[in-house]
Amino acid sequence: NKLKEIEIDTKFEKSLSNEFTQMYYEAWAGMEENFYNENFHGQDWQKHRDHYAIYLPYITSRSELRLIFNDMLGELNTSHFGFNSNGKEEDIYYGTHSLATGILFDNNNPFEVSGIIKESPSDISGKNLRKGDKLIAVNGEKVNANENREKYFSAPSFSNEIALTLERNGTEFNVNFHPASSGNIRNLIYDEWQDENQNYVDSKSKNRIAYVHMKNMTGGELQKFKEDLVSSNEADKDALILDLRYNTGGNVHDEVLRFLSQRTYLNWKYREGKLAKQSNFGYSDKPIVLLVNEQSLSDAEMTAAGFKELGLGKIIGTETYRWIIFTSGKGLVDGSFYRLPSWGCYTLDGKNLETEGVSPDIYVGESFKDRLTGNQPQLDKAIEVILDELNK
């Protein structure tokens, strides 16, 4: 029963061309067996297979394979699909990292400071940047007004420090920052936008209406949604605006709808105490408005459809994106992966949300000009509808 090492030395030929052909037909078959609509949205799926297969002998790279396969998938006019394949031959990094400071620059004077993003590197005590300061140099390199400003805030690798030279009233001064990633800055901009909406609703409703925005339908955002609505600041308010505009989806619609559907069914109290409601958070007893727009997609559309079917309140905004199929995926032996849009979503009267979306009860658009000038027609209508109901 002793182990004996056996040495094996062998070689085999690897043909990327043959691999690409196998991957093409295997991924096509996976879609053929699992696509949610048995009529393939009226397309002849076998015909498309044969049409795009003509190009297989001429494919010389994975990028070309990705291109023709995803083009073929595009013939289905569907969402939640995609084919991806990466190999060692593509393991070359040509990208750059953003060295973001949180400084907002003026649109007409692209090297002049117009504002500071809250809690960003430039918002730290001691930086003392002001509106009107002019950027002169980055890491000692003088800026050229004729070049793209972002050139100076990008690098092949992330740096722990960036040095800016600015001018104020004819005097130059230096400021050093620990830069942030572009993703971090996007999150801070989102936080500012949400806070501005919250303050806007508080001001217009005199603190009578709770406001919560969900940017996606994931577990973390669900937890934040519940924490916000059970906090004393929001739970004691008379109504709710749930904002699903720009929501990119996930899979927590059932939890959100269940929470919003809670009704008060009893009161209880400790001896000589105050009566308290059961359940503690009966939002279904209050007026609720759901905000959606043309960028509310995927599970946000499931949530909106359920909200409408359950009669939880009014939906205000524009039609949703029409981009909702629940999806799995399969991997190939080389590590390639393709998504499988397999579970269609339908209203109780049979409408396909992938092609129909969800229409609002009250249509209110929001133009690019509104966004530039700070107008809030959708929030204004939501506040108006709720206050009218509260004042009846």
Model-predicted regions and their roles:
Residues 56-108, 171-197, 383-384, 390-392:
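Extended, small/polar residue-biased N-terminal targeting/export presequences
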Residues 21-25, 29, 46, 50, ...:
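Solvent-exposed, polar/charged alpha-helical surfaces in well-ordered, non-transmembrane soluble domains
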Residues 94-145, 343-344:
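PDZ/PDZ-like domain segments forming the peptide/carboxylate-binding groove
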